[in-house]
């Protein structure tokens, strides 16, 4: 894509914002190379890649990437025989640590949330990460942040131990000298210091002859000599030899560790590449959150729909968002309206958002944006007059337009700002229309701004062209920056003049001079503006309702998944309990069989072997392995009748058969829900004997329903009605009843459940299953 376009649309500023969100040079390097892709698959992949990280970033706290650094130069040096120092080895160690932490984080996501498989790109990156635990362990055990540990090798530990003990002896020797009363007046200061890596004491020059040893230095005034006493010369020499030995051993260990790094060179480079990309994508995610970015959907057919788009470089708290759309077969949009009304900002918003999207950045629009992939974006925006070339504004623009017309094609987007401006209005308007015709013949998508009234009629004479305008508030005498698609701009001169106090006589006379047609056009445009405003308001309301519907759908879907998961858990637990019982029974049977055989052998009891084996097999056949699917006994058509109590296997709920529709289907009542279900999904259950009732007759039960409707009740009424109903239900020997309170604000549901929680006749309660009415129902189990 043209660099000139990226510069005019200020894409470099977007990149600088993203770069500020990176942690490492690896991420910043990738941001610096970020540019719009033009291949459909690449654009879609980059967007999905960013969206995956953004989803995780918005839900979870990502592991820290601090300390991540570029190590490829170090790997190269290790491969050609160089030796890495401790600081460089720590950079390798930190890379491994960062990748391990991120992989652990991702694995925890997999365990906690099965939905994480919807991140296939990130999953692939995590699978690419190599196992470098051994290398990490070696570096970690031998290096701290500044130096090798004493324990890095047996030899190093021994050398440093000798250095320490020798230094201690030297210190003790010098302490005796400097603390001696006889030497107090001979020393410049009672301290031990170091010169030329040797331990020395500061002696006054006039007492030089009193101290045998080597003079290593003197003060600037010459009054103090730094002398190494002869008593410690040999010990200092020993320290020097040990320091050399330490350096040799240190080099050997670093060489060994560097060799290990070289052996894992490929893995380290893969880790660097993946974690650098993670840093880059995380920076994109952070920036997306700051602009409330959303993911667009890309189409191979030419499409542009940007709901409530705004320019990301403007203050999002004050900028006016506009829906930019090329509807149906529209290929050219012409924006008219007042200067400083936001026409140029609209052009830049469209161009910049497309560049951002094709660079894998989430875009500043509402959800639901749709875009196609453009091979290039061309723009002629702003005053690019060249002083060096002595070009006028018109000439400068025309030179740029000529270049655009030579390069653009049907897969390009072209943005013209004030097309044809800077010359005679009639000639400029004619040129503008001719240029637009030419670009339309090429097939490019075009958005242009103009103040020429001739271009308002342009769209009515050509197919695929739409007018648009920026709104002007005549009451405040200022633009609203609101884009009106499909509505041409109109002159506000008369309204503004009247608002400013110009006499109506002058205004009315002026109106007669412009002709009836022009006045009718302005009236028509004013009507279109009002209709457009009303449509926008309706669209906003529809968007709100759609969001609410989607949220409700997602909530219900999530609850259904929870229900299915809970149902599976209960089934597994039931199977496990059943298996344990069968195992116990089998074990008991084995014991009995053993006793019977023993009895037969001892007393000759008349028990046949094959009969014992048959009994044992009957018990074994009852066992159901946990891994097998639920083995349910299917009821034949002639075994289920209307009025039978059954268990609906797919829902795990009890119900009553109301009607047999055919040999395959029956109508079943489950609580307040009637459903037509396959007979193979039904399991006949035994009716429980009713408890005798002293208070009411059997006839009374039939008059009490299993559900109580409380929708529309106030709190006091609902509680009173609920108490009476529960008393009647208990007397009727009901085990379970349904309280229907509806969803609403949830206040009535809360009141009902709080009261049930305290009621002495209520054993437990729960929210309704989806098959029972969901949130709008509470199911109470009675004592």
Swiss-Prot record:
<dbReference type="InterPro" id="IPR045076">
    <property type="entry name" value="MutS"/>
</dbReference>
<feature type="binding site">
    <location>
        <begin position="337"/>
        <end position="344"/>
    </location>
    <ligand>
        <name>ATP</name>
    </ligand>
</feature>
<dbReference type="GO" id="GO:0045910">
    <property type="term" value="P:negative regulation of DNA recombination"/>
</dbReference>
<dbReference type="Pfam" id="PF00488">
    <property type="entry name" value="MutS_V"/>
</dbReference>
<comment type="function">
    <text>Acts as a ribosome collision sensor, splitting the ribosome into its 2 subunits. Detects stalled/collided 70S ribosomes which it binds and splits by an ATP-hydrolysis driven conformational change. Acts upstream of the ribosome quality control system (RQC), a ribosome-associated complex that mediates the extraction of incompletely synthesized nascent chains from stalled ribosomes and their subsequent degradation. Probably generates substrates for RQC.</text>
</comment>
<feature type="domain" description="Smr">
    <location>
        <begin position="708"/>
        <end position="783"/>
    </location>
</feature>
<keyword id="KW-0238">DNA-binding</keyword>
<dbReference type="GO" id="GO:0005524">
    <property type="term" value="F:ATP binding"/>
</dbReference>
<dbReference type="Pfam" id="PF01713">
    <property type="entry name" value="Smr"/>
</dbReference>
<keyword id="KW-0255">Endonuclease</keyword>
<dbReference type="GO" id="GO:0019843">
    <property type="term" value="F:rRNA binding"/>
</dbReference>
<dbReference type="GO" id="GO:0006298">
    <property type="term" value="P:mismatch repair"/>
</dbReference>
<dbReference type="InterPro" id="IPR000432">
    <property type="entry name" value="DNA_mismatch_repair_MutS_C"/>
</dbReference>
<dbReference type="InterPro" id="IPR002625">
    <property type="entry name" value="Smr_dom"/>
</dbReference>
<keyword id="KW-0378">Hydrolase</keyword>
<comment type="subunit">
    <text>Homodimer. Binds to stalled ribosomes, contacting rRNA.</text>
</comment>
<dbReference type="GO" id="GO:0072344">
    <property type="term" value="P:rescue of stalled ribosome"/>
</dbReference>
<dbReference type="GO" id="GO:0004519">
    <property type="term" value="F:endonuclease activity"/>
</dbReference>
<dbReference type="InterPro" id="IPR046893">
    <property type="entry name" value="MSSS"/>
</dbReference>
<dbReference type="GO" id="GO:0030983">
    <property type="term" value="F:mismatched DNA binding"/>
</dbReference>
<protein>
    <recommendedName>
        <fullName>Endonuclease MutS2</fullName>
        <ecNumber>3.1.-.-</ecNumber>
        <ecNumber>3.6.4.-</ecNumber>
    </recommendedName>
</protein>
<dbReference type="InterPro" id="IPR036063">
    <property type="entry name" value="Smr_dom_sf"/>
</dbReference>
<dbReference type="InterPro" id="IPR005747">
    <property type="entry name" value="MutS2"/>
</dbReference>
<comment type="similarity">
    <text>Belongs to the DNA mismatch repair MutS family. MutS2 subfamily.</text>
</comment>
<dbReference type="InterPro" id="IPR007696">
    <property type="entry name" value="DNA_mismatch_repair_MutS_core"/>
</dbReference>
<keyword id="KW-0067">ATP-binding</keyword>
<dbReference type="GO" id="GO:0140664">
    <property type="term" value="F:ATP-dependent DNA damage sensor activity"/>
</dbReference>
<dbReference type="GO" id="GO:0043023">
    <property type="term" value="F:ribosomal large subunit binding"/>
</dbReference>
<dbReference type="Pfam" id="PF20297">
    <property type="entry name" value="MSSS"/>
</dbReference>
<keyword id="KW-0547">Nucleotide-binding</keyword>
<keyword id="KW-0699">rRNA-binding</keyword>
<comment type="function">
    <text>Endonuclease that is involved in the suppression of homologous recombination and thus may have a key role in the control of bacterial genetic diversity.</text>
</comment>
<dbReference type="GO" id="GO:0016887">
    <property type="term" value="F:ATP hydrolysis activity"/>
</dbReference>
<keyword id="KW-0540">Nuclease</keyword>
<keyword id="KW-0694">RNA-binding</keyword>
<dbReference type="InterPro" id="IPR027417">
    <property type="entry name" value="P-loop_NTPase"/>
</dbReference>
<dbReference type="InterPro" id="IPR036187">
    <property type="entry name" value="DNA_mismatch_repair_MutS_sf"/>
</dbReference>
């Amino acid at each position: 894509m043209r660099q000139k376009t990226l510069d005019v649309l200020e894409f470099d500023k977007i990149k600088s914002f993203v770069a500020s969100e990176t942690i490492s040079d690896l991420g910043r390097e990738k941001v610096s190379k970020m540019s719009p892709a033009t291949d459909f698959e690449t654009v879609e992949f980059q967007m999905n890649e960013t969206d995956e990280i953004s989803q995780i970033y918005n839900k979870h706290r990502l592991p820290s990437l601090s300390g991540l650094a570029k190590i490829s130069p170090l790997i190269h040096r290790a491969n050609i025989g160089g030796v890495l120092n401790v600081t460089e080895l720590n950079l390798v160690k930190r890379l491994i640590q960062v990748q391990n932490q991120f992989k652990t984080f991702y694995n925890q996501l997999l365990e906690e949330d099965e939905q994480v498989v919807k991140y296939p790109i990130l999953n692939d990156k995590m699978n690419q990460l190599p196992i470098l635990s051994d290398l990490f362990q070696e570096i970690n055990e031998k290096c701290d942040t500044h130096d090798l540990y004493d324990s890095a090798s047996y030899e190093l530990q021994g050398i440093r131990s000798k250095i320490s003990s020798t230094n201690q002896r030297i210190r003790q020797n010098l302490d005796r000298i400097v603390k001696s009363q006889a030497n107090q007046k001979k020393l410049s200061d009672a301290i031990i210091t170091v010169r030329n890596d040797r331990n020395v004491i500061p002696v006054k020059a006039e007492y030089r002859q009193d101290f045998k040893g080597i003079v290593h230095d003197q003060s600037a005034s010459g009054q103090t000599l730094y002398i190494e006493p002869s008593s410690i010369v040999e010990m200092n020499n020993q320290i020097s030899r040990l320091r050399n030995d330490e350096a040799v051993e240190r080099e050997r260990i670093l060489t060994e560790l560097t060799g290990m790094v070289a052996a894992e060179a490929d893995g380290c480079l893969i880790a660097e590449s993946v974690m650098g990309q993670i840093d880059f994508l995380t920076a994109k995610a952070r920036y997306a959150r700051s602009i409330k970015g959303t993911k667009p959907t890309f189409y191979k057919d030419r499409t542009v729909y940007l709901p409530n788009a705004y320019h990301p470089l403007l203050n999002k708290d004050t900028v006016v968002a506009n829906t930019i759309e090329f509807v149906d077969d529209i290929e050219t949009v012409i924006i008219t309206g007042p200067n400083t009304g936001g026409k140029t900002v609209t052009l830049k918003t469209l161009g910049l958002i497309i560049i951002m999207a094709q660079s894998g950045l989430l875009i500043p629009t509402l959800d639901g944006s749709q875009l196609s992939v453009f091979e290039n974006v061309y723009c002629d925006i702003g005053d690019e007059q060249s002083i060096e070339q002595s070009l006028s504004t018109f000439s400068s623009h025309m030179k740029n337009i000529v270049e655009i017309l030579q390069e653009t094609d049907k897969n390009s987007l072209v943005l013209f700002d004030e097309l044809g401006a800077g010359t005679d209005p009639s000639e400029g308007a004619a040129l503008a229309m001719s240029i637009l015709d030419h670009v339309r013949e090429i097939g490019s998508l075009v958005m242009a701004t103009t103040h020429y009234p001739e271009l308002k009629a342009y769209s009515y004479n050509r197919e695929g062209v739409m007018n648009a305008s920026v709104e002007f508030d005549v009451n405040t005498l200022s633009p609203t920056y609101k884009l009106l698609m499909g509505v041409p701009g109109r002159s506000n001169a008369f309204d503004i003049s009247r608002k400013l106090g110009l006499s109506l006589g002058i205004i009315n006379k002026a109106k007669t001079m412009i002709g009836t047609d022009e006045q009718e056009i302005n009236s028509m445009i004013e009507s279109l503006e009002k209709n457009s405003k009303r449509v926008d308001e309706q669209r906003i309301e529809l968007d709100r309702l759609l969001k609410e519907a989607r949220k409700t759908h997602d909530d219900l879907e999530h609850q259904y998944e929870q229900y299915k998961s809970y149902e599976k858990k209960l089934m597994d637990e039931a199977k496990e309990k059943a298996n344990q019982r069968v195992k116990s029974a089998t074990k008991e049977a084995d014991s009995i069989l053993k006793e019977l055989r023993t009895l037969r052998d001892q007393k000759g009891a008349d028990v046949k072997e094959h009969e014992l084996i048959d009994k044992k097999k009957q018990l074994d056949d009852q066992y159901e392995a946990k891994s097998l699917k639920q083995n349910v006994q299917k009821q034949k058509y002639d075994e289920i009748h209307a009025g039978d109590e059954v268990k609906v296997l797919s829902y795990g709920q009890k119900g009553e058969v109301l009607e047999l529709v055919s040999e395959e289907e029956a109508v079943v009542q489950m609580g307040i829900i009637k459903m037509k279900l396959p007979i193979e999904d039904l399991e006949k259950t035994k009716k429980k004997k009713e408890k005798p009732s002293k208070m009411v007759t059997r006839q009374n039960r039939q008059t009490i329903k299993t559900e109580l409707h409380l929708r529309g009740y106030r709190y006091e009424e609902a509680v009173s009605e609920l108490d009476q109903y529960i008393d009647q239900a208990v007397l009727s020997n009901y085990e379970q009843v349904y309280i229907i309170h509806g969803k609403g604000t949830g206040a009535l549901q809360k009141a009902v459940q709080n009261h049930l929680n305290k009621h002495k006749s209520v054993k437990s309660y729960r929210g309704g299953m989806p098959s029972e009415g969901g949130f709008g129902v509470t199911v109470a189990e009675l004592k």
